[in-house]
Swiss-Prot record:
The modification Phosphoserine is found at S389. Binds 1 Mg(2+) or Mn(2+) ion per subunit. It comes from Mus musculus. Changing C379S: Decreased inhibition by cadmium ions. It catalyses: D-threo-isocitrate + NADP(+) = 2-oxoglutarate + CO2 + NADPH. Homodimer. The modification N6-succinyllysine is found at K126, K400. Mn(2+) binds at D252, D275, D279. GO terms for cellular component: cytosol; mitochondrion; peroxisomal matrix. This is Isocitrate dehydrogenase [NADP] cytoplasmic. The modification Phosphotyrosine is found at Y42. Its main location: cytoplasm. Pfam families: Iso_dh. Its cofactor is Mg(2+); Mn(2+).
Length: 414
């Protein structure tokens, strides 16, 4: 390429540990040599979040709102051990949760499929796209330890000054325990429904919403009712025209049905269910390192793409000791490619769109040609049978991808 592609504005969020190392390599080898970006960078590494009292996370979310495209590296969500390790001021909330709560919308996760990576669930021949409602429930809950005997109650105080309504949660008679209050909002559930129906129509696949409305009759029942109402009013005729269906399923029934299916559907999950099932589905396709994750906001134009896995702490500890690592960068690369593809769509930028697709194609073609990281070699041969010659280390694999991308773009004569 004789000149760089003009890419426009992108918010990038740096992360933690091994994924932070990989993130810099992706920019250095795969993105910045070819694309001129107006990059708005936010360091969401745990130390900087602590130093800014987590303000940097909120600032990043506001920047995504402004520029409509964000790409995020994996980050540490601290627990007690991490608070001690980094001497944190407090146990900061998940940055993903904070960003999602500011932006709203739905997280859609889809497996990246390579022909030579065997699937643990062998019947899955088509992708399953999980739409995770990225707002509220446990992720915005108030939870606490009940120190001793006493009553836990929930009170609703109407703004119009009419009478309060109090519900008894539990009377702790013989000691303490734990309690939690969580919520969701009709508007957010409606946005979730619209995003899910639109995704199903764009893919031409059926849509299933899973809840536990038999137990949470009011809470989960609200999700079921809102989805049904919106489907009947706005989407039923479009679904019928495409010969696809929408159904509500109980979560336990849906999990069983998904295992037996061949894939090829959209699965709309509440926040916690989506968190769990997206990892389960990713592993079923072969690897957690092979999963795209995109937050689509209700305005239809704001998108945040991220890796669907953690910070790969074990590999980072090895890297710190100077030991060889073989860390899979594919999900982090796809965070960039999906973000750039959306930027291209917003700006009607055909060159950037071509680049984003070329980057994804290179990842899949390189793996299918037999060049891969250790986790993927283990999927093929089984971990005990993997020899050193079967895989590339972290840096070798990134170099190989860089070499193949350079060749593909030269061939295209962009």
């Amino acid at each position: 390429m004789s000149r760089k592609i003009q890419g426009g504005s992108v918010v990038e969020m740096q992360g933690d540990e091994m994924t932070r190392i990989i993130w810099e390599l992706i920019k250095e080898k795969l993105i910045l040599p070819y694309v001129e970006l107006d990059l708005h960078s936010y360091d969401l590494g745990i130390e900087n979040r602590d130093a800014t009292n987590d303000q940097v996370t909120k600032d990043a979310a506001e920047a995504i709102k402004k520029y409509n495209v964000g790409v995020k590296c994996a980050t540490i969500t601290p627990d007690e051990k991490r608070v001690e390790e980094f001497k944190l001021k407090q146990m900061w909330k998940s940055p993903n949760g904070t960003i999602r709560n500011i932006l709203g919308g739905t997280v859609f996760r889809e497996a990246i499929i390579c022909k030579n990576i065997p699937r643990l669930v062998t019947g899955w021949v088509k992708p399953i796209i999980i739409g995770r409602h990225a707002y509220g429930d446990q992720y915005r809950a108030t939870d606490f330890v009940v120190p001793g005997p006493g009553k836990v109650e929930i009170t609703y105080t109407p703004k119009d000054g009419t009478q309060k309504v109090t519900y008894m949660v539990h009377d702790f008679e013989e000691g303490g325990g734990v309690a939690m209050g969580m919520y969701n909002q009709d508007k957010s559930i409606e946005d979730f429904a619209h995003s899910s129906f639109q995704m199903a129509l764009s893919k031409g696949w059926p849509l299933y919403l899973s809840t536990k409305n038999t137990i949470l009759k009011k809470y989960d029942g609200r999700f079921k009712d809102i989805f049904q109402e919106i489907y009947d009013k706005k989407y039923k005729s479009q679904f019928e025209a495409q010969k696809i269906c929408y159904e509500h399923r109980l979560i336990d029934d849906m999990v069983a049905q998904a295992m037996k299916s061949e894939g090829g559907f959209i699965w709309a999950c509440k926040n916690y269910d989506g968190d769990v099932q997206s990892d389960s589905v990713a592993q079923g396709y072969g690897s957690l390192g092979m999963m795209t994750s995109v937050l689509i906001c209700p305005d239809g134009k704001t998108v945040e793409a991220e890796a669907a896995h953690g910070t790969v702490t074990r590999h980072y500890r090895m890297y710190q000791k100077g030991q060889e690592t073989s860390t899979n960068p594919i999900a982090s690369i796809f965070a960039w490619s999906r973000g750039l593809a959306h930027r291209a769509k917003l700006d009607n930028n055909t060159e950037l769109s071509f680049f984003a697709k070329a980057l994804e194609d290179v990842c899949i073609e390189t793996i299918e040609a037999g060049f891969m990281t250790k986790d993927l070699a283990a999927c093929i041969k089984g971990l005990p049978n993997v020899q050193r010659s079967d895989y590339l280390n972290t840096f070798e694999f990134m170099d190989k991808l860089g070499e193949n991308l350079k060749a593909k773009l030269a061939q295209a004569k962009l």
